[in-house]
């Protein structure tokens, strides 16, 4: 007597398809998290770096500000890529401050952005302060040097002992340096950023970033 072959149940086949579909969806979600999560800005400087990188070849995000000039400089020596600079116009600068600028280097392995400005101490002496932010390392370093101006030339003093000597001569303390930094970087540059971008952070809450200050223990 011939035995009839058993046929797989249609319900079992449908369940298998649903299970495989759910597994595939789960794997896709996990892979998406691994891809997108590291790209999310972890601090306010990440936001600035990433948004500028996205927009600088077209309509740079900083074009939303009225008191800045946005430039693209091309490096012909190696890769012919453009690198952006944002410079504040003279009429937008607070009294006794000069040359507020934001620069980016997307080619650098450390993925750098810099904020710089000068504080006028007297007619021929400035303090130059600047930050270097590494998008890759998520650390912000703050530096200082003295600028001596004579006619059309400038002499930069970076040796810490000499810098301290000039600061002492003009009665400038580490707290004063902190106040200069706060007035320009926090109250001007980062405040402007929050006015043109829906930031998750603020000038008083940078987010996840390690900050190192050259003059911290002076």
Question: What do the PLM-derived regions correspond to, one by one?
Answer:
Residues 85-218:
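Extracytoplasmic electrostatic interaction patches
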Residues 2, 16-19:
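Positively charged n-region of N-terminal signal peptides that target proteins for export
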Residues 19-35:
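Hydrophobic membrane-insertion alpha-helices, especially the h-region
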Residues 31-121:
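N-terminal export/targeting and maturation segments
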Residues 13-14, 112:
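Juxtamembrane/transmembrane-helix boundary motifs in multi-pass membrane proteins
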Residues 12, 21, 26, 105-106:
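Intrinsically disordered, low-complexity segments of exported/surface proteins
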């Amino acid at each position: 007597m011939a035995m009839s072959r058993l046929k797989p149940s249609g319900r079992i086949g449908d369940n298998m398809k649903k299970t495989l579909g759910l597994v595939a969806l789960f794997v896709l979600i996990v892979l998406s998290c691994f891809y997108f999560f590291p790209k999310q800005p972890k601090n306010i400087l990440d936001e600035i770096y990433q948004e500028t990188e996205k927009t600088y070849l077209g309509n740079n995000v900083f074009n939303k500000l009225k008191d800045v000039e946005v430039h693209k400089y091309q490096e012909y020596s190696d890769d012919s890529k453009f690198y952006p600079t944002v410079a504040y116009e003279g009429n937008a600068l607070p009294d006794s401050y000069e040359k507020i600028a934001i620069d980016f280097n997307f080619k650098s392995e450390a993925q750098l952005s810099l904020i710089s400005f000068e504080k006028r101490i007297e007619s021929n002496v400035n303090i130059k302060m600047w930050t270097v932010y590494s998008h890759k390392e998520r650390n912000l370093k703050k530096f200082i040097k003295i600028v001596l101006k004579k006619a059309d030339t400038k002499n930069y003093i970076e040796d810490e002992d000499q810098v301290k000597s000039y600061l002492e001569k003009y009665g400038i303390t580490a707290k004063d340096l902190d106040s200069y930094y706060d007035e320009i970087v926090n109250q001007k540059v980062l405040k402007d950023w929050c006015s043109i971008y829906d930031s998750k952070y603020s000038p008083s809450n940078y987010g996840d970033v390690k900050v190192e200050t050259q003059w911290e223990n002076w």
